[in-house]
Amino acid sequence: MGTPASGRKRTPVKDRFSAEDEALSNIAREAEARLAAKRAARAEARDIRMRELERQQKEYSLHSFDRKWGQIQKWLEDSERARYSHRSSHHRPYLGVEDALSIRSVGSHRYDMFKDRSSRLSSLNHSYSHSHGMKKRSSDSHKDLLSGLYFDQRNYSSLRHSKPTSAYYTRQSSSLYSDPLATYKSDRASPTANSGLLRSASLASLYNGGLYNPYGPRTPSECSYYSSRISSARSSPGFTNDDTASIVSSDRASRGRRESVVSAADYFSRSNRRGSVVSEVDDISIPDLSSLDEKSDKQYAENYTRPSSRNSASATTPLSGNSSRRGSGDTSSLIDPDTSLSELRDIYDLKDQIQDVEGRYMQGLKELKESLSEVEEKYKKAMVSNAQLDNEKNNLIYQVDTLKDVIEEQEEQMAEFYRENEEKSKELERQKHMCSVLQHKMEELKEGLRQRDELIEEKQRMQQKIDTMTKEVFDLQETLLWKDKKIGALEKQKEYIACLRNERDMLREELADLQETVKTGEKHGLVIIPDGTPNGDVSHEPVAGAITVVSQEAAQVLESAGEGPLDVRLRKLAGEKEELLSQIRKLKLQLEEERQKCSRNDGTVGDLAGLQNGSDLQFIEMQRDANRQISEYKFKLSKAEQDITTLEQSISRLEGQVLRYKTAAENAEKVEDELKAEKRKLQRELRTALDKIEEMEMTNSHLAKRLEKMKANRTALLAQQ
């Protein structure tokens, strides 16, 4: 870790600790807020689940109540059907059509009521399943109508898929239901038939329990109890149809109560075999059991509240009649009064035993209810404590997770800071290298600028020289052109003068010849014909003055002199000649002056001295020298122009290089400034990162200490609990 800059002010330790405490308090407040939100969400979800469970329990209780009511209705129909068949067979062996229709209408009415109730229940279940997306319910809500409160699915499946009823059971049950008095008469006829009746009654009770009992098969004790009740009732002297119905109803009520107790005991034994009772407590509905017990108690109280005096009276008074009727039915056997008294004692003993067994069953049922309520309370307390511990555990886990997340984030930030520091240091090294390279380039550019300035100065000097040379060349060209013009004019004048001289000589000769011919013609009287007249024709025009004959050329010269007499023309020609001569002299003077100027410039003063004599050779040599000098000057001029073009190109190239170097130097300066600013910024960021790292290390140590304290507190709480 690098050292901070010298001019940086470090924050005091107290301020840093206060900032850390504030940060920790902020983190704790945020964690508490998140935890409170989480707890609220959990509480809301728990309330929703409880409401859903209550609703399902209500629906299940309604379903079970309707199912039990349907079973009770079916049982009542069967009992009434059996009672009616018993009465009809005892009193009216043949029924009328109206009675049969009334019985059928009553049964069908009750069946329709049960069917309507079951259809309403199925429609309610169907609508609920569709409204809630056919979600999975518990196994209790999907049981069949044949299943009872504590019905075992295995027994139900075995009952549904197996057919345990045999022909013997069918015959026995049909015989019992169709003609119970016949069995009673046969019982009175012989004591052996009494035992057969007991066996048939026990078998009928077994079959009836297997058919109408939805709570599973009966135990042998229950079968023996039911058979003993029937046998005692049959053997009593005051046995009537009402007593039979009351006994059957009381037997059914006690049987339902015992079946509920036994089914609950079987359920708890099965649940103990499967696992624990607490996990299966939710499958038991206490209100249904209590309602069933209340119903069975009411039925039992209604059936067994008759006074014992009636039983005793009915047992003592018609003993002789019964014995006489039995004796009349079977004359071969006689019943002893001692045996009847012993049988009555046995019957009362059996009744006492039955009441004791029922009392024990009721006591066991109450104890079972109390234990079940205690188990439910313990289960609720355990669930509450478990929920609290779970909440505390989740809170601690959440705090640990948040602290782990904070530590991981700080570690990631540390790694990110280290990586950024390395990247910035590498970038700084690259920028330093680029700065050194740019400094070297800048030095080269400065050297190029210096060379450019030198070249510009040299170019300016050359340009001045070229300007002076071009001016001189231009002047020389002008002078040469002017001299060429003058020379051409002088040559023309010279030729013209030579022509004039020749013409003058010719004219003089012709004049002399003419004078001689005139003299001779005057002497002889002849006329000279000019040469230009063809065929010897003579012009008949009148000639003013004397007659003169001249040549063709002389005539042209005279015509060019103008009109007038020959003397006037000759005087004109003589004046023009003098003028031409004066012009020639002037031109010669000017030529000499120009030659003197040229001789001063080229140092050829001595060469022009011979021109005064008018020699043509010297003039030709001078002309050649002038032409040679002109060609040399032209060559120098073309060379100078080429040098000028090359220099201009090099100047433009150097100017472009200078511009590029200037832009590069400016960019380098900008980059250097940016690099310096970036370096300062990186140094500041490095210092802030180091400060943050130190603060994070201190906060990390504080958080680790707090985490250790929380772990110690948690272990202490767990040890206390």
Curated annotation (Swiss-Prot):
Disulfide bond sites: none
Role summary: May function as activator of the canonical Wnt signaling pathway, in association with DVL3, upstream of CTNNB1/beta-catenin. Positively regulates Toll-like receptor (TLR) signaling in response to agonist probably by competing with the negative FLII regulator for MYD88-binding.
Phosphoserine PTM sites in chain numbering: S18, S190, S202, S309, S312, S320, S324, S328, S332, S333
The protein's assembly and partners: Interacts (via N-terminus) with DVL3. Interacts with FLII. Weakly interacts with MYD88 in resting cells. Following LPS-stimulation, the interaction with MYD88 is rapidly enhanced; the complex gradually dissociates to basal levels after 6 hours of stimulation. Interaction with MYD88 is regulated by LPS-induced phosphorylation at Ser-202. In the presence of LPS, competes with FLII for MYD88-binding.
Residues found modified as Phosphothreonine: T331
Keyword Flavoprotein carried by entry: no
Effect of S190A: No change in LPS-induced NFKB activity
Record's signal peptide: none
Origin species: Homo sapiens (Human)
InterPro entries reported in the protein's UniProt record: LRRFIP1/2 (IPR019139)
Tissue: Widely expressed, with highest levels in heart and skeletal muscle.
Keywords assigned by UniProt, alphabetized: Coiled coil, Phosphoprotein, Wnt signaling pathway
GO molecular function, one term: LRR domain binding
Region (Disordered): 232-262, 295-338
Protein name from the UniProt record: Leucine-rich repeat flightless-interacting protein 2
Region (DVL3-binding): 1-370
Family assignment from sequence similarity: Belongs to the LRRFIP family.
Residue ranges with Polar residues bias: 237-251, 305-338
Post-translational modification: Ser-190 and Ser-202 are phosphorylated in response to LPS stimulation. Ser-202 phosphorylation regulates the LPS-induced interaction with MYD88.
Pfam families cross-referenced by the UniProt entry: LRRFIP (PF09738)
